[in-house]
């Protein structure tokens, strides 16, 4: 029996040798059909959802980038606005400081002027008061000196100077002599 098997094998036409890397045609056909079905399902169901998720992520990332850029631009604008306000405040402070300094100098000048005027007024009032006191003292002294000179003249002359005209003339002569001596001494 073994011989018949060999004989049958020898009588069969020879086929090409079997390559283990290339599968038979029926395997290829039956493998392509499920692959096509899986590919169709993948293309119609999975791939659109995957594309949708990718689009959402891309939009979210781009939106985040745009929001970040907008926030950055807003922050830059706020910084510029802050710097501008700070510069304006510094300018205003410098102007206020200069105005205050100018007003202070005006106040000092006004106060000096007022003090000088008040000082001059006080000195003038003092001079007037001194002049009035001097005139009063001179009048009192003239009166006393007149009386003393009359008393002295009466003692020297030994006569009474009752006559007002004589008395007045004697006093005037005596005081005129004193004034001449006082002005000559200066």
Swiss-Prot record:
Relate the assembly described in the record: F-type ATPases have 2 components, F(1) - the catalytic core - and F(0) - the membrane proton channel. F(1) has five subunits: alpha(3), beta(3), gamma(1), delta(1), epsilon(1). F(0) has three main subunits: a(1), b(2) and c(10-14). The alpha and beta chains form an alternating ring which encloses part of the gamma chain. F(1) is attached to F(0) by a central stalk formed by the gamma and epsilon chains, while a peripheral stalk is formed by the delta and b chains.
Keyword check for Nucleotidyltransferase = no
Which Pfam families does the annotation name?
ATP-synt_B (PF00430)
Gene behind this protein: atpF
Q: Where in the cell is it found?
A: Cell membrane
Q: Is this entry keyworded Transmembrane?
A: yes
Tell me the function of this protein: F(1)F(0) ATP synthase produces ATP from ADP in the presence of a proton or sodium gradient. F-type ATPases consist of two structural domains, F(1) containing the extramembraneous catalytic core and F(0) containing the membrane proton channel, linked together by a central stalk and a peripheral stalk. During catalysis, ATP synthesis in the catalytic domain of F(1) is coupled via a rotary mechanism of the central stalk subunits to proton translocation.
**Name of this chain's protein:** ATP synthase subunit b
Q: How does it sit in the membrane?
A: Single-pass membrane protein
Q: Which GO terms describe its molecular function?
A: proton-transporting ATP synthase activity, rotational mechanism; proton-transporting ATPase activity, rotational mechanism
- What Gene Ontology cellular-component terms does the record carry? plasma membrane; proton-transporting ATP synthase complex
């Amino acid at each position: 029996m073994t011989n018949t098997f060999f004989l049958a094998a020898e009588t069969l036409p020879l086929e090409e040798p079997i390559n283990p890397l290339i599968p038979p045609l029926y395997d290829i056909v039956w493998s392509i059909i499920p692959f096509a079905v899986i590919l169709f399902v993948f293309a119609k169901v999975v791939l659109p959802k995957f594309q949708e998720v990718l689009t959402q992520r891309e939009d979210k990332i781009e939106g985040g980038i745009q929001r970040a850029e907008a926030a950055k631009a807003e922050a830059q604008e706020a910084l510029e606005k802050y710097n501008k306000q700070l510069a304006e405040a510094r300018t205003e402070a410098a102007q206020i400081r200069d105005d205050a300094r100018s007003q202070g100098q005006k106040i000092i000048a006004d106060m000096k002027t007022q003090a000088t005027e008040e000082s001059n007024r006080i000195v003038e009032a003092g001079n007037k008061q001194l002049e009035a006191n001097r005139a009063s003292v001179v009048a009192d002294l003239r009166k006393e000196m007149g009386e003393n000179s009359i008393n002295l003249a009466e003692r020297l002359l030994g006569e009474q100077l009752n006559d007002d005209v004589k008395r007045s003339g004697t006093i005037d002569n005596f005081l005129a002599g004193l004034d001449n001596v006082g002005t000559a001494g200066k």
